[in-house]
A protein has these predicted regions:
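Collagen/collagen-like triple-helix sequence repeat recognition
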Residues: 1-62, 73
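Consensus "Asn ladder" position of solenoid repeat domains
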Residues: 146, 171, 205-206, 228, ...
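Glycine-rich repeat segments that build the extracellular carbohydrate-interaction surface of secreted
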Residues: 62-66, 84-103, 115-121
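Parallel beta-helix/beta-solenoid
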Residues: 90, 112-113, 120, 137-139, ...
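Right-handed parallel beta-helix/beta-solenoid
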Residues: 48-84, 101, 277, 285-290
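Extracellular beta-strand/beta-solenoid scaffold signature
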Residues: 105, 127-135, 152-160, 180-195, ...
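Short, T/G/N/S-enriched strand-turn elements that build extracellular solenoid repeat scaffolds
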Residues: 82-88, 103-112, 132-136, 157-158, ...
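Right-handed parallel beta-helix/beta-spiral solenoid domain characteristic of secreted/periplasmic
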Residues: 77-79, 114-161, 175-181, 186-188, ...
Length: 290
């Protein structure tokens, strides 16, 4: 038969218990894309100019000017004495001895390897006392472009040199005139090697004149003496040393002897044959005392 009519809705039941809490979602969303860079702001005002800087002295390039006071050895503010320059320079550096007259009354000692004493036009060292003005030891030192002389004849050498591989180049070394024959003169000399303590000395392009001897080469020293001019002296004296002489020449007044080979000096090269030694040195007058 037919379905009967729907009965009335029953009353609402009681509310059921609250269900469990669901998981917490992420607190921060994903970072969005970076926005476009904004326009550059205007340049700020220039700040005040700082104080002037200073140039520190360079211990490898030291400058000396005769009579300067209160210097620091820089080119702009040089020392006043060569002694200050030698004290300040570091090994392998150069002491620039600018033009001027430098009176010397006490010995200057240079023993810093590789240092150059560099003279300039008018750089004159004047010895004013009976002392050796310059003693060189060590290795690889150069004395270049200086003039050495004295106010009176003193019985000393201008340069005493010992060590290895030194150079005496482009200098003028002379004494004041002395009366009478040269064998009566005060024994002043251009340079002297330290006995047994000078190896491979180069002496080149110097002028030696108006003193007892251009040089005294002590025993057991070696080197080369090349292209020098010597006059008004008693020449180079070789005392049991071994030096090569080549290209040297002799001026006027003539030397009493150009090269003297003292007793005990070796025979054979580099001295023999004597005729070749003479020919290789502008027909040198040689006193062979061996």
């Amino acid at each position: 038969g037919p379905t009967g009519a729907t009965g009335p809705t029953g009353p609402t039941g009681a509310t059921g218990p609250t269900g469990p809490r669901g998981p917490t979602g992420p607190g921060v969303g994903a970072t969005g894309p970076t926005g476009a860079t904004g326009p550059t702001g205007p340049t700020g005002a220039t700040g005040p100019t700082g104080p002037p800087g200073t140039v520190e002295p360079n211990p490898f390039q030291v400058y000396v000017l005769a009579g300067a006071v209160g210097g620091d050895g820089s080119q702009a503010n040089p020392f006043g004495t060569i002694q200050e320059g030698i004290a300040a320079v570091l090994p392998t550096g150069t002491v620039h001895i600018l033009g001027g007259t430098y009176p010397i009354s006490s010995t200057m000692v240079l023993n810093k390897n590789g240092v150059t004493l560099q003279g300039y036009s008018g750089s004159i060292i004047v010895l004013t006392a009976p002392v050796i003005p310059l003693v060189v030891t060590g290795n690889g030192i150069t004395v270049d472009g200086l003039t050495f002389t004295s106010d009176n004849p003193y019985p000393v050498e201008f340069i005493q040199i010992g060590g290895t591989n030194h150079r005496i180049t482009n200098n003028i070394i002379f004494g004041p005139p002395q009366p009478g024959p040269s064998d009566t003169w005060v024994v002043n000399r251009g340079f002297v090697t330290q006995s047994g303590n000078m190896t491979n000395l180069l002496v080149r392009n110097n002028i030696f004149h108006t003193m007892r001897q251009a040089a005294y080469l002590n025993p057991n020293t070696t080197g080369n003496i090349i292209n020098n001019v010597v006059y008004n002296t008693r020449g180079f004296v070789n005392d049991e040393a071994i030096f090569v002489f080549s290209g040297n020449s002799w001026g006027i007044p003539e030397n009493a002897v150009d090269i003297a080979l003292l007793e005990g000096t070796i025979t054979g090269p580099p001295f023999d044959p004597i005729t070749e030694l003479s020919e290789n040195n502008s027909l040198a007058t040689i006193s062979d005392q061996r």
